[in-house]
Amino acid sequence: MIMKIVTSHEMAEIDKLTIDYYGIPSTVLMERAALSIVKHVLKFNPENLIILAGPGNNGGDGIACGRILKNKVKNIKIFQLFPEEKLSEDCKLQLSVAKKFGIPIVVGYPDNDQIDKADLIIDAIFGTGLKREIEGKVAEFIEILNSFKKLTVAVDIPSGVSSDTGEILGAAIKANLTVTFGLPKRGHLLYPGKDYTGELFIEDIGFPEELTNNENLKISLIEREFALSLMPPRPKYSHKTRYGHVFVIAGSTGKTGAAMMTAKAALRAGSGLVTMAVPAALKVVFQSKVLEEMILPLPCTMNTLSKQALPEIMDFVKEKANSIAFGPGVGVNEDIEIILRELILNSSCPIVIDADGLTVLSKILNVLKDAHSEIVLTPHPGELSRLINIPVKDIEKQRIDIAQKVAQELNVIIVLKGVPTVIAEPQGRVYLNTTGNPGMATGGSGDVLTGIIASLIGQGLSPLYASVFGVYIHGLSGDIASRRKGFHGLIAGDIIETLPEAFIELTDEIDSEP
């Protein structure tokens, strides 16, 4: 089953329907939540435990944890940070039960000495429903608590992290691990919230599958089982033409490497054939570099392909190509604009557009409404900013919503690169990637991704699933490369060279499971 990702509103609706329609009492859900937290807390064998309880049901979860842990942990103290009249009904109930169990409860905040002596802290102050900025004494306390760097387990989401955007609402607790319920929330996966979440554990506490896997939940997580299900098959009885012919239109004076990386990545991702359309003036340069790739020298200006190359390009597309990778290092001028326009209007196969191609596209964006084939755009936030005239900082704050909106408005697949990479399609579905690392922030990494996605389209995946699987395997390859090279020394060529191992690791991990 594909793991969905939800907003605070969507999770609240799931919670409400579980209670009101399916008839599972809220106290039962709270008990299950507490048991799941306790399971993780006991891994650390704490002796001195502090529970920070807020006014809502998140606080109730924390108090229930204290009751369950009473005979399992030497010293437990619950700090109820808010007066009883401000507590939710379920939180009041848990507080009443905890008192009857004889658990020490303090209304107020722990002092520095108490924090210092604790070997584990449960953060149950605020949950996913928090919308306002944390201010005043609570904010001051959180800053003090963070300075102690104590082992901290967050209930549902670290207090102060927006569950919808990952933004910090004034102040936030920095957790070592977070135990969330039912489904992950956006704020767990978007920065800076991801940094505050620590290791994320998603626990099933009894929400009906009809709710957690509902088709109206449009955002999904790309995990390895899902990725494996998308991997193109490789039958024993087959031929190179079965695995597609990628047409790479890329490269110009000073940027031949971009074209080479795109082509090489397409081959490493499994393409049967790859041909590069290159400026004839650079023919010797490309011939000195290629082995498995083929080149098609075409008419050119002083530095780039010329509009005179268009007839040969369109003939090749019509007769041989299964997918097109357009843009890496191709240059930016009127001739390239004419070529791209013609491809969008008349190409018989899908086009993946990146880098210089996106810069050119920003000048002719309205042509997308008449596109003849499916289009995949792979911008980083700066490139998307040029396309849609929205500041980069706003794109970073609303990665999911903006990618989703642009995909729908332009009728294209958007691969918004970054952390996390977001894939969105015109019908509103969105996928968040789970692989990749900071070492991949290096020149050429995007060219590699373009080649991979174009390759997967040529092998028969839909442009959407080619993008989803391509982003995952690209990140996994980068993760393998970083184990050997580290983050600082990793280059785009390393990602290409470890692609075969990424495919092996993905399949072996699944095959080795019991």
Swiss-Prot record:
<feature type="binding site">
    <location>
        <position position="329"/>
    </location>
    <ligand>
        <name>(6S)-NADPHX 2</name>
    </ligand>
</feature>
<dbReference type="InterPro" id="IPR017953">
    <property type="entry name" value="Carbohydrate_kinase_pred_CS"/>
</dbReference>
<dbReference type="InterPro" id="IPR036652">
    <property type="entry name" value="YjeF_N_dom_sf"/>
</dbReference>
<feature type="binding site">
    <location>
        <begin position="417"/>
        <end position="421"/>
    </location>
    <ligand>
        <name>ADP</name>
    </ligand>
</feature>
<comment type="similarity">
    <text>In the N-terminal section; belongs to the NnrE/AIBP family.</text>
</comment>
<keyword id="KW-0067">ATP-binding</keyword>
<feature type="region of interest" description="NADPHX 2; for dehydratase activity">
    <location>
        <begin position="380"/>
        <end position="386"/>
    </location>
</feature>
<keyword id="KW-0520">NAD</keyword>
<feature type="binding site">
    <location>
        <position position="156"/>
    </location>
    <ligand>
        <name>(6S)-NADPHX 1</name>
    </ligand>
</feature>
<keyword id="KW-0456">Lyase</keyword>
<dbReference type="Pfam" id="PF01256">
    <property type="entry name" value="Carb_kinase"/>
</dbReference>
<feature type="binding site">
    <location>
        <begin position="437"/>
        <end position="446"/>
    </location>
    <ligand>
        <name>ADP</name>
    </ligand>
</feature>
<keyword id="KW-0479">Metal-binding</keyword>
<dbReference type="InterPro" id="IPR004443">
    <property type="entry name" value="YjeF_N_dom"/>
</dbReference>
<dbReference type="GO" id="GO:0110051">
    <property type="term" value="P:metabolite repair"/>
</dbReference>
<keyword id="KW-0547">Nucleotide-binding</keyword>
<keyword id="KW-0413">Isomerase</keyword>
<feature type="binding site">
    <location>
        <position position="447"/>
    </location>
    <ligand>
        <name>(6S)-NADPHX 2</name>
    </ligand>
</feature>
<dbReference type="GO" id="GO:0046872">
    <property type="term" value="F:metal ion binding"/>
</dbReference>
<dbReference type="GO" id="GO:0052856">
    <property type="term" value="F:NAD(P)HX epimerase activity"/>
</dbReference>
<feature type="domain" description="YjeF N-terminal">
    <location>
        <begin position="11"/>
        <end position="213"/>
    </location>
</feature>
<comment type="function">
    <text>Bifunctional enzyme that catalyzes the epimerization of the S- and R-forms of NAD(P)HX and the dehydration of the S-form of NAD(P)HX at the expense of ADP, which is converted to AMP. This allows the repair of both epimers of NAD(P)HX, a damaged form of NAD(P)H that is a result of enzymatic or heat-dependent hydration.</text>
</comment>
<keyword id="KW-0630">Potassium</keyword>
<dbReference type="GO" id="GO:0005524">
    <property type="term" value="F:ATP binding"/>
</dbReference>
<dbReference type="InterPro" id="IPR000631">
    <property type="entry name" value="CARKD"/>
</dbReference>
<dbReference type="GO" id="GO:0052855">
    <property type="term" value="F:ADP-dependent NAD(P)H-hydrate dehydratase activity"/>
</dbReference>
<feature type="binding site">
    <location>
        <position position="159"/>
    </location>
    <ligand>
        <name>K(+)</name>
    </ligand>
</feature>
<feature type="binding site">
    <location>
        <position position="58"/>
    </location>
    <ligand>
        <name>K(+)</name>
    </ligand>
</feature>
<feature type="region of interest" description="NADPHX 1; for epimerase activity">
    <location>
        <begin position="127"/>
        <end position="133"/>
    </location>
</feature>
<feature type="binding site">
    <location>
        <position position="123"/>
    </location>
    <ligand>
        <name>K(+)</name>
    </ligand>
</feature>
<feature type="domain" description="YjeF C-terminal">
    <location>
        <begin position="223"/>
        <end position="506"/>
    </location>
</feature>
<feature type="region of interest" description="ADP-dependent (S)-NAD(P)H-hydrate dehydratase">
    <location>
        <begin position="223"/>
        <end position="514"/>
    </location>
</feature>
<keyword id="KW-0521">NADP</keyword>
<dbReference type="InterPro" id="IPR029056">
    <property type="entry name" value="Ribokinase-like"/>
</dbReference>
<keyword id="KW-0511">Multifunctional enzyme</keyword>
<protein>
    <recommendedName>
        <fullName>Bifunctional NAD(P)H-hydrate repair enzyme Nnr</fullName>
        <ecNumber>4.2.1.136</ecNumber>
        <ecNumber>5.1.99.6</ecNumber>
    </recommendedName>
</protein>
<dbReference type="InterPro" id="IPR030677">
    <property type="entry name" value="Nnr"/>
</dbReference>
<dbReference type="GO" id="GO:0046496">
    <property type="term" value="P:nicotinamide nucleotide metabolic process"/>
</dbReference>
<dbReference type="Pfam" id="PF03853">
    <property type="entry name" value="YjeF_N"/>
</dbReference>
<comment type="similarity">
    <text>In the C-terminal section; belongs to the NnrD/CARKD family.</text>
</comment>
<feature type="region of interest" description="NAD(P)H-hydrate epimerase">
    <location>
        <begin position="1"/>
        <end position="215"/>
    </location>
</feature>
<feature type="region of interest" description="NADPHX 1; for epimerase activity">
    <location>
        <begin position="57"/>
        <end position="61"/>
    </location>
</feature>
